[in-house]
């Protein structure tokens, strides 16, 4: 377990000086200068900026809700009730691009500066939206100027080393566990290709990402989610029209 900085810059720097394993959540100051980069870069203290809930400005989460139609993501809707997705995504907070440039993207540029000075950066998505949050965090880290390869390392070997599991996972090497993500497109060409997952191999079993059914040597369909179970008293029909849960009222709009 590692503590977070709590959006307090002086607390963050004290954590670095004290030799904490890492700082969770971004520091609320951007940009930073040589005093911070040299101190942090020589400390071996990790950094998990969690831009998706960016301290000190607009969150990256708002950016990706604004820039993508989340309610149209068919794969996401396989694993999350539509009422939950609609309520989070169809009514969006909108902001000018320059506001994001001065908020989570500026923070991401500071992350890149720290990485260039020796700080190991890790990807952590805060659990904002299972299925997309990790991708959004990855793409947000990339917005700061890291190369595609550097960005991918934050989600793989850097994070594995950070939690003490780097000898077992985090890279494809002889002797490590064969837990593998199989993508349709190469994220080294476009970082958003991280979202083209075909198969997940974990603990010697392979799963189809579109259905979560086990495939390969021992095919086995997954069990139904609670909202797919015929014995479940549903409060809404499953996968109806995308606007079917919007209840307009005289004084505004309400949604599940």
Locations of the language-model features?
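Acidic, glycine-enriched loop/beta-strand segments at the rims
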Residues: 132, 147-152, 162-197
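Short aromatic-centered micro-motifs
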Residues: 200
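Short catalytic-loop micro-motif centered on adjacent basic/acidic residues
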Residues: 1-3, 22-25, 123-124
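Active-site neighborhoods of metal-dependent hydrolases
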Residues: 26-144, 217-219, 223, 228-256
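Divalent metal-coordination and catalytic microenvironments
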Residues: 23, 47, 126, 141, ...
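Structural recognition of alpha->loop->beta junctions
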Residues: 10-32, 118, 143-151
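Divalent metal-binding pocket/active-site signature
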Residues: 1-15, 53-54, 105
């Amino acid at each position: 377990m590692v503590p977070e900085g709590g959006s307090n810059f002086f607390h963050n720097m004290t954590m670095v000086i004290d030799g904490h394993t890492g700082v969770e959540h971004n520091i609320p100051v951007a940009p930073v200068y040589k005093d911070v980069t040299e101190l942090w870069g020589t400390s071996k203290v990790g950094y998990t900026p969690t831009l998706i809930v960016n301290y000190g400005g607009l969150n990256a989460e708002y950016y990706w809700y604004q820039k993508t139609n989340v309610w149209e993501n068919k794969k996401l809707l396989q694993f999350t009730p539509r009422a939950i997705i609609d309520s989070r995504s169809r009514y969006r907070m909108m902001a000018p691009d320059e506001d994001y440039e001065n908020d989570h993207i500026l923070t991401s540029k500071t992350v890149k500066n720290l990485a260039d000075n020796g700080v190991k950066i890790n990807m952590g998505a805060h659990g904002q939206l299972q299925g997309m949050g990790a991708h959004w965090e990855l793409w947000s880290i990339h917005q700061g100027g890291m190369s595609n390869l550097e960005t991918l390392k934050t989600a793989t070997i850097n994070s594995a080393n950070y939690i003490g599991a780097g000898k077992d996972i985090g890279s494809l090497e002889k002797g490590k566990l064969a837990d593998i993500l199989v993508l349709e497109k190469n994220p080294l060409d476009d970082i958003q290709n991280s979202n083209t997952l075909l198969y997940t191999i974990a603990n010697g079993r392979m799963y189809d990402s579109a259905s979560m059914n086990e495939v390969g040597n021992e095919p086995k369909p997954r069990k139904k989610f609670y909202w797919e179970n015929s014995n479940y008293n549903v409060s809404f029909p499953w996968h109806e029209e995308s606007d079917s849960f919007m209840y307009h009222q005289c004084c505004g709009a309400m949604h599940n």
